[in-house]
């Protein structure tokens, strides 16, 4: 690794795992992963909310359907799965569902509201 890449990776790791024992990630850290292409983003809001606007290339599975549809993400199980909703409440539930199924999932703190404020 070159000297420019190492600090970025350390920074992402600190932000990503900064909340000890909690499966969370800040919107700023999530944006870094998004920009690097090293994560899949899961929108757990309703279809209407998703259609009104979402993170580009995100996967949409409403949290109410996730217990039956989580297999759609099976090929990304070991990747970073960033779960988001509007503010972070539904995504916490979605994250817990995925964690129980063995996914490497993180709840994006503040949801889409914080994402939009982090650019």
What are the residue ranges of the model-derived segments?
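Helix-termini ("caps") and immediately adjacent flexible loops/tails
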Residues: 7-11
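Rhodanese-like catalytic fold shared by cysteine-dependent sulfurtransferases
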Residues: 2-6, 16-39, 48-80, 86-119
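Structural scaffold elements adjacent to functional motifs in cytosolic proteins
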Residues: 41-43
């Amino acid at each position: 690794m070159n000297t420019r890449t190492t600090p970025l990776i350390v920074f992402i790791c600190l932000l990503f795992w900064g909340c000890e024992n909690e499966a969370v990630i800040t919107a700023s850290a999530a944006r870094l992963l998004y920009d690097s292409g090293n994560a899949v983003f899961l929108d757990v809001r309703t279809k209407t909310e998703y259609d009104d606007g979402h993170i580009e290339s995100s996967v949409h599975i409403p949290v109410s359907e996730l217990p039956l549809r989580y297999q759609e993400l099976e090929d990304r199980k070991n990747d970073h799965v960033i779960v988001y909703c509007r503010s972070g409440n539904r995504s916490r539930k979605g994250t817990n569902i995925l964690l129980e199924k063995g996914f490497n999932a993180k709840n994006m703190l503040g949801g889409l509201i914080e994402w939009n404020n982090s650019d």
